[in-house]
Amino acid sequence: MEPTSSAAMARQTWELENNIPAAASDPDALDAIYRYDEAAQARVQQEKPWANDPHPFRRAKISALALLKMVVHARAGGTIEVMGLMQGKCEGDAIVVMDAFALPVEGTETRVNAQADAYEYMVEYSTINKQAGRLENVVGWYHSHPGYGCWLSGIDVSTQMLNQQFQEPFLAVVIDPTRTVSAGKVEIGAFRTYPKDYKPPDEPVSEYQTIPLNKIEDFGVHCKQYYALDITYFKSSLDSHLLDLLWNKYWVNTLSSSPLLGNRDYVAGQIFDLADKLEQAEGQLAHSRYGMLMPSQRKKEQEESPLAKVTRDSSKITAEQVHGLMSQVIKDILFNSVHPSNKASTSAPDSSGPEPMVEA
């Protein structure tokens, strides 16, 4: 199989796994989302739907190009958090992300700090974009959570609240590059914070996700201060060429890396975290067995038990390890296996050559 066809097939698989729609037959209808209507955007700024509605935006529409740029940037950071901005517009109850660019920030394993040079870069980039005819404004920021899921920490909530106060519409996107490599599908979340004095209704979490034990407290304290948006993806008729150019970098990194080897520290941390959660679940089980059942305990019983959550986490670790092992087996078959026909041709003696000379 040709390398180009292998890369194209891998890109198509990536698009299918992440529910990125195929190009439509009518390019004009497909590219309509890219048309920027300044009057419509100015009208939204005048009406300010976010002033009276605690969640005016319920959907995030992200272009395939912006998604891949954010994933490549997040993967390049490894275990260090990275940060960037997103450009786009708003359409009804949706924030449309059309492009993204990285910021030169100082990152650690748990946070990112934007310095003065990052703000200068941000202003200069936006100015040059306008000069080039790209009229889209900044509509949000993205950053990575390497290995600990897509949610907003206390610092993230404060940052997002500040941005929503002065720069609406604004969206927060979180990508987990470590879990993306392990699972194959992009681990991503899009969020907006509620107004400061707003108390949201008590609703169950729509989708379960694994949170490390040392992050659960931070997650639990702030999880009612923001809400998640439904994410969909789109691409234009001209995106294919740009995606091909960007995919070459992503594809080479995918081929040359192994989730089993590259994520060893992450997997070891997950197993240690699982052991701590098992110990905690055992302690809670002992208390519930010998203690009095209070009303708060009965309410907790209606929720998923800690042991059931541990079972989910262990199943997820197992599935990711099997996925990594399968990818290694497939790569071994593709690049290291020798065909039987080649073996036979190399081991068989060459009968077509000249006969050896024998003295009479």
From Swiss-Prot:
<dbReference type="GO" id="GO:1990641">
    <property type="term" value="P:response to iron ion starvation"/>
</dbReference>
<dbReference type="GO" id="GO:0008237">
    <property type="term" value="F:metallopeptidase activity"/>
</dbReference>
<feature type="compositionally biased region" description="Polar residues">
    <location>
        <begin position="341"/>
        <end position="350"/>
    </location>
</feature>
<feature type="binding site">
    <location>
        <position position="156"/>
    </location>
    <ligand>
        <name>Zn(2+)</name>
    </ligand>
</feature>
<feature type="short sequence motif" description="JAMM motif">
    <location>
        <begin position="143"/>
        <end position="156"/>
    </location>
</feature>
<protein>
    <recommendedName>
        <fullName>COP9 signalosome complex subunit 5</fullName>
    </recommendedName>
</protein>
<keyword id="KW-0736">Signalosome</keyword>
<dbReference type="GO" id="GO:0046872">
    <property type="term" value="F:metal ion binding"/>
</dbReference>
<keyword id="KW-0217">Developmental protein</keyword>
<comment type="similarity">
    <text>Belongs to the peptidase M67A family. CSN5 subfamily.</text>
</comment>
<dbReference type="Pfam" id="PF18323">
    <property type="entry name" value="CSN5_C"/>
</dbReference>
<feature type="region of interest" description="Disordered">
    <location>
        <begin position="341"/>
        <end position="360"/>
    </location>
</feature>
<dbReference type="InterPro" id="IPR050242">
    <property type="entry name" value="JAMM_MPN+_peptidase_M67A"/>
</dbReference>
<dbReference type="GO" id="GO:0051726">
    <property type="term" value="P:regulation of cell cycle"/>
</dbReference>
<keyword id="KW-0645">Protease</keyword>
<feature type="binding site">
    <location>
        <position position="143"/>
    </location>
    <ligand>
        <name>Zn(2+)</name>
    </ligand>
</feature>
<dbReference type="GO" id="GO:0006508">
    <property type="term" value="P:proteolysis"/>
</dbReference>
<keyword id="KW-0482">Metalloprotease</keyword>
<comment type="subunit">
    <text>Component of the CSN complex, probably composed of CSN1, CSN2, CSN3, CSN4, CSN5, CSN6, CSN7 and CSN8. Interacts with MCM2.</text>
</comment>
<dbReference type="GO" id="GO:0005737">
    <property type="term" value="C:cytoplasm"/>
</dbReference>
<feature type="binding site">
    <location>
        <position position="145"/>
    </location>
    <ligand>
        <name>Zn(2+)</name>
    </ligand>
</feature>
<keyword id="KW-0479">Metal-binding</keyword>
<keyword id="KW-0378">Hydrolase</keyword>
<feature type="region of interest" description="Disordered">
    <location>
        <begin position="293"/>
        <end position="315"/>
    </location>
</feature>
<dbReference type="GO" id="GO:0019784">
    <property type="term" value="F:deNEDDylase activity"/>
</dbReference>
<keyword id="KW-0862">Zinc</keyword>
<dbReference type="Pfam" id="PF01398">
    <property type="entry name" value="JAB"/>
</dbReference>
<dbReference type="InterPro" id="IPR037518">
    <property type="entry name" value="MPN"/>
</dbReference>
<dbReference type="InterPro" id="IPR000555">
    <property type="entry name" value="JAMM/MPN+_dom"/>
</dbReference>
<dbReference type="InterPro" id="IPR040961">
    <property type="entry name" value="CSN5_C"/>
</dbReference>
<dbReference type="GO" id="GO:0008180">
    <property type="term" value="C:COP9 signalosome"/>
</dbReference>
<comment type="function">
    <text>Probable protease subunit of the COP9 signalosome complex (CSN), a complex involved in various cellular and developmental processes such as photomorphogenesis and response to hormones. The CSN complex is an essential regulator of the ubiquitin (Ubl) conjugation pathway by mediating the deneddylation of the cullin subunits of SCF-type E3 ligase complexes, leading to decrease the Ubl ligase activity of SCF. Involved in early response to iron deficiency.</text>
</comment>
<feature type="domain" description="MPN">
    <location>
        <begin position="60"/>
        <end position="197"/>
    </location>
</feature>
